[in-house]
Amino acid sequence: MKIAVDAMGGDHAPEALIEGALLAGPQCSADILVIGNEARLSSLLAHSGDSTSLKVVHAPQVIGMGEAGPMALRRKREASLTIAMRLLAENEVDAVVSAGNSSAVVSAARHLVGLIPGLRRPAMAVPLPTPSGKLLLLDAGAHAEATAIHLAQSAVLAHCYLKIEEGLNRPRIGLLNIGHEPAKGNRAVQRAFALLRRCSLEFTGNVEPNDLFAGKVDAVICDGFVGNVLLKMYEGFSETVCRFLESLANHDGRDFSGGAGRILERFRRDYHYEFVGGAPLLGIRKTVVAAHGRSRATAIANAIRLACRLQEARVFERLAGIVEEDGALTELRHQNTLLMIDQLKDKWGFAHR
């Protein structure tokens, strides 16, 4: 197995990417290729004292974090991200990990590697720890806006992914909204509600943010803007809780080396983004993991380990197979057509009363 790491992508590249790749290496049964400026990467590896465990692939260009993704891909065909995705598309590597420009990661994966047939676009999936287990969030940031069909297709991806990852035969899917009623939310959310209610998925209806962690759903669907805001709020809250508990212990003079310390460490490991590592880009035909832009070495190492695990279990390959065999996308298209016809009938009937 070979994993390509976009070593020039991210706020702390390339240092954090190289350090993370070196950390992941001993626990990942894969050859790791780091893609980027050869002179700079080789210098970092020499300085680390380990210049042989990673293979350097030269890339003369870098896509910046603030660049428009699709345009940057067209202009920078020899960027580290572009080369990594090209290697994946050509079967030279088995997975790609990048902490770079998320718009560029999504665009490169979509156009160079390709989508599952019938799918309009991919979605980032992030498992959020809750007291009752994990809650899968889609979309966590691949696309800021979404139509009803995009939201419904994300629900199909969540359904199929949870079948593989969690062994759930009928995972409960909720639609993130500001209220439980069908008429709540914007047009896209209202239409997605109507569409999902017609499908054979285990759709539980709208779910409000205050009910997200009550164990009522296994996955929650939203557009990438809302999902990314929710994810970062969640990350910020968990970090604040850790700091609050530490400051409380210091203020009270308590010793956190015993049981309380183990509880705090368990909380940090369960809820801190570094230990999640990255988000699989569901809907892409091959394994792509997008790491947080601010990732440092620990997060990068965990993102690489996640990519390694997903590839070993053939999750992306199996996901594509289940999506096609399940027939959910075909059903979705059919129900979307029927919904459009019904809505036109209602509109026509109203206009001719």
Swiss-Prot record:
Recorded hits in InterPro entries, A to Z, give: FA_synthesis (IPR003664), Phospholipid_synth_PlsX-like (IPR012281)
Catalytic activity field:
a fatty acyl-[ACP] + phosphate = an acyl phosphate + holo-[ACP]
The source's domain of life comes to Bacteria
Molecular function terms, GO-annotated: phosphate:acyl-[acyl carrier protein] acyltransferase activity
Give the UniProt subcellular location, in the record's own words.
Answer: Cytoplasm
Q: Which Enzyme Commission number(s) are on file for it? A: 2.3.1.274
The family note in this entry says: Belongs to the PlsX family.
- What subunit structure does UniProt give? Homodimer. Probably interacts with PlsY.
Q: What does this protein do?
A: Catalyzes the reversible formation of acyl-phosphate (acyl-PO(4)) from acyl-[acyl-carrier-protein] (acyl-ACP). This enzyme utilizes acyl-ACP as fatty acyl donor, but not acyl-CoA.
Q: What is this protein called?
A: Phosphate acyltransferase
